[in-house]
Amino acid sequence: MTFRQPARRTLSGRFGALKCHNGGCSCDSKAMENDILRQSDPEKLHRIRHSTSHILAMAVQKLFPETKVTIGPAIENGFYYDFDRPTPFTPEDLKKIEKEMRRIVQQKLPLVREEVPREAMRERLEALGEPYKLELFEGFDHDAPVSLYRTGDWWDLCAGPHVESTAEIHPNAFKLRSVAGAYWRGDEKRAQLQRIYGTAWETPEQLEEFLRREEEAKKRDHRKLGRELGLFVFSDLVGPGLPLWTPKGALLRYILEEFLRKEQVKRGYQQVVTPHIARVDLFKTSGHWFKYKDDMFPLMATSEEEGAEEGFVMKPMNCPFHIQIYKSELHSYRELPIRLAEFGTVYRYEQSGELGGLTRVRGFTVDDSHLFVTPEQLDDEFKKVVDLIQFVFRSLQLGDGFSARLSFRDPTSDKYIGSDAAWEKAQAAILKASQDLGLKYFVAEGEAAFYGPKLDFIFRDALGREWQLGTVQVDYILPERFELEYVAEDGSRRRPVMIHRAPFGSLERFIAILIEHFAGDFPLWLAPEQVRILPVTDQFVGYAESVKDRLVSLEMRAEVDASSERLGKKIRNGETAKVPVLLVVGESEANSGTVAVRTRVEGEKDKGTLPVEEAIAYLQERLAKRT
């Protein structure tokens, strides 16, 4: 399965160029109507942000005339502009720039578009001494008109669009956020620039709400909580983008894997295991080597004989391996569908600057499965996969705030393989299933994998951020490239259709999302440490251990805090570690065979003192409900 790591994560941004169907898409759903950050016209907000980036550059060149300008686009949640300046921007500089931007905005200056003859534009840029703009200009289509936008006595080479006047930009609805390094045109061999990031909104209230959510997002950052909860670490010696899972983190992974593995067995999946490397020929046959090579690690153990390229590569995907398992014997139509599943680790050669915590890594595990079905089985099996994914989301308390993105081919692009007919059949199958299931979906052209269209579930977390989670893909093309067959009822050899699916997607990224969604407060069934028993003094450690043994015998994850800390400190430590249930035991509890139950369930009072078996019944009830 082609699984794209980058998480669609935004506190506000809508999906661009959407085609909404069946009651709308996620950004127009009832759940979003009262979201202050979603009350803006996205096109208007884009113009405001783009124009604010121009105001930023105008202010910078007024305050620091030696600065050269490069590019300044609108981005999700704001804008940035890259500058070439001999000295670094300081926090004090940002305050001065922001003040100057407000002064400019309050002048209510028009932003006027002008078309300029090519030669005249070249002369202007040369006279200004703006080498970066000149380089951009020289790369423009010679037949296309060249335009600039003028604001007062300052102008920028730009195609737009922009607001008509700075009066449309509220002086208290934007803020400069930070300065970061950037290379000209993203090339490490080119000049290093300074990038100033900012955010802009229609109203001060929206800005305030955005900043509030960003502060909350910092508290929930999975990198911060991952360290505090002892789930994973990184090592410079191991390398960037390669997380190391600690015992608690590994246990969390195991819990998720076992949960899905057991459910898959109920639904007819068979577990397989495949190697981490393979001959490059495997990926040449699949097409990955030609369409995905830049994202793969380089060849290992290479040899060249008469110009032939040979060697091994670390796998970027699991599907070609599952195909080889299917192909190892001839199958009858009676055996189909065949559902092969694996928690397979794959490797992508991400650039170091693109790595980020668990959301963008170089080695990650995908809950990959590939179904080999007859054309007649495709619709039913696709719907069953969607049902499995929805079951997973419900079980993990992710709610119903999902929309479906139908990631289809851009027919004008050459990045895809396979025939038009194969693509049309696959896209039609996904569209029909989505309509039959009543999914709220939108079509995103150009988002398909290079060998097939897919349905991506888009999830909105507790902060209103959007993430891509589970994926289902229909594939007529790889069965053709690998010449897969089954024996039909009439004895003829026919091609199966493949369904690729991954409810979690990248397990690493999925865990990052869970950490941030729950702010580290995992549901009881999912928490690596479910219960911590706190003896009041050393005298009651033995009783605490006996309670732990009883819980462990019932396959609950329990620990005893046998430290010499006072009880208040033990309770605080348990709360900081976000252990769902704390059991306090002292003389009274030891004598009566009870425990004092403290719970972290929001809105639920502590259960008070209960007999051990009643406390166990309470825990088992919550575990059964996955709360």
Curated annotation (Swiss-Prot):
It catalyses: tRNA(Thr) + L-threonine + ATP = L-threonyl-tRNA(Thr) + AMP + diphosphate + H(+). One of its GO terms (biological process) is threonyl-tRNA aminoacylation. Its cofactor is Zn(2+). It holds the Pfam family HGTP_anticodon. InterPro entries: aa-tRNA-synt_IIb (IPR002314), aa-tRNA-synth_II (IPR006195), aa-tRNA-synth_II/BPL/LPL (IPR045864), Anticodon-bd (IPR004154), Anticodon-bd_dom_sf (IPR036621), Thr-tRNA-ligase_IIa (IPR002320), Thr/Ala-tRNA-synth_IIc_edit (IPR018163), ThrRS_anticodon (IPR047246). GO terms for molecular function: ATP binding; metal ion binding; threonine-tRNA ligase activity; tRNA binding. One of its GO terms (cellular component) is cytoplasm. Belongs to the class-II aminoacyl-tRNA synthetase family. Homodimer. This is Threonine--tRNA ligase.
